[in-house]
């Protein structure tokens, strides 16, 4: 069963807040945000796939990946990790790039703060996304970000539920 996803948009602050609780330990959810082979399993909303090109998960490191569509179309992105607090939070900047990793002008960029909190139900994930302007946020939402990110989080939930031991 899919748990609820909170998805709040604040036009005045050009921010989006996302929250979801997973029936899994913080360590397990953390791994699915920080290990390339696990990210590739859920980051892209089906029928798209995520393909990691490079990953260096450390402060000032980065993750370059391609979203690969059903017709093999490819869209590239880069995540630069700013601050990382093990099993607690990740601060990162996300940009659209060309195949070589160069930022695409005119495309929205996002600053993310991802939080992982142990709760009775498992792990509460919070994601705060900050945009430079309302126009950038509106453009991102117009590209289907809300539906795509929600589908990805539900795919992650399916994966985590399959790993949970049956009692």
Q: Regions from the language model: what does each represent?
A:
Residues 13-19, 26, 62, 76, ...:
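Intrinsic-disorder/low-complexity, polar/charged segments enriched in Ser/Thr/Lys/Arg/Asp/Glu/Gln
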Residues 17, 37-76, 167:
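Short beta-edge strand/loop motif at the mouth of beta-sheet-based domains
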């Amino acid at each position: 069963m899919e748990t609820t996803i909170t998805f709040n948009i604040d036009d005045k602050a050009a921010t989006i807040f996302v929250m979801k609780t997973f029936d899994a330990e913080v360590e397990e959810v953390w791994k699915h945000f920080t290990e390339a082979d696990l990210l590739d399993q859920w980051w892209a909303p089906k029928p798209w796939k995520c393909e990691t090109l490079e990953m260096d998960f450390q402060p000032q490191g980065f993750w370059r990946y391609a979203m690969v569509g059903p017709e093999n179309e490819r869209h590239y992105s880069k995540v630069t990790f700013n601050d990382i607090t093990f099993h607690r939070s990740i601060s990162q900047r996300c940009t659209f790039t060309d195949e070589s990793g160069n930022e695409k002008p005119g495309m929205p960029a996002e600053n993310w703060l991802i939080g992982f909190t142990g709760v009775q139900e498992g792990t509460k994930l919070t994601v705060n996304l900050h945009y430079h302007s309302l126009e950038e946020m509106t453009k991102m939402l117009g590209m289907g970000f809300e539906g795509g990110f929600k589908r990805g989080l539900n795919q992650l939930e399916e994966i985590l539920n399959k790993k949970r031991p049956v009692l």
